[in-house]
Amino acid sequence: MKSILVVTVCAALALFAPSAQAQERPVQTFKSSAGPIKITPVYHASLEIEAGGKVIVVDPAKPAVFTGLPQADLILITDIHGDHLDPSLIAAESKAGTEIIAPPAVVKTVTTASPISNGEKKTWGAWTIEAVPMYNLTRGPEAGKLYHDKGRGNGYILTYGGTRIYLSGDTENIPEMRALKNIDVAFVCMNLPYTMTPEEAADAVKAFHPKVVIPYHYGKSDLSAFEKGVAGTGIEVRVLDWYPKG
């Protein structure tokens, strides 16, 4: 009987304990005039932002696992590709009243989403959401085609309590990114052949000079090359694990 009781108790504890992955997530916290902003890397391009009692989920896509994290008040999507959206995860991370904001190209598939295009702004509660360009300059699957056409997907600048957070989406070293101003935290992609090299990403980051830069969507890129490229600029580089095992 004692052994059965022990097994039962252990099973119950395991059921209610957060997963190892949830416990080990490298959560980042940033200050704003409206209170702290907590950002949780989930996987690849998927992340969760919490501030003021509200939750924003960005690019919910498999194999991201949101176990132990709250469901979204807002889901923000950057592009049509499968590493940026998955209908089953969008449903799983939604609750009553969840809003979805996405580029018009995504709205064709995610029909409950509200569209936002490059250059447009929306106010969502205490947040300002600005859609900015993300696209390829030269890289594509074949001559005359690009992986990401200009205007199809969105990068985003999210502002809360005066703190400005940039999400690059899938992009190369484009003029619009280089011209960004007053970015506090930048999430910048890099991986070939779809976006850019670490060296190109570093060159872009040096141009708009955020206070903090966090590489994401990096796959097997050499992050040391990115760090080397940004060294000596005064920009803080935070290298996080976006590809947890298990």
Segments and roles (model prediction):
Residues 61-109, 181-187:
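Active-site metal-binding motif and surrounding structural segment of the metallo-beta-lactamase
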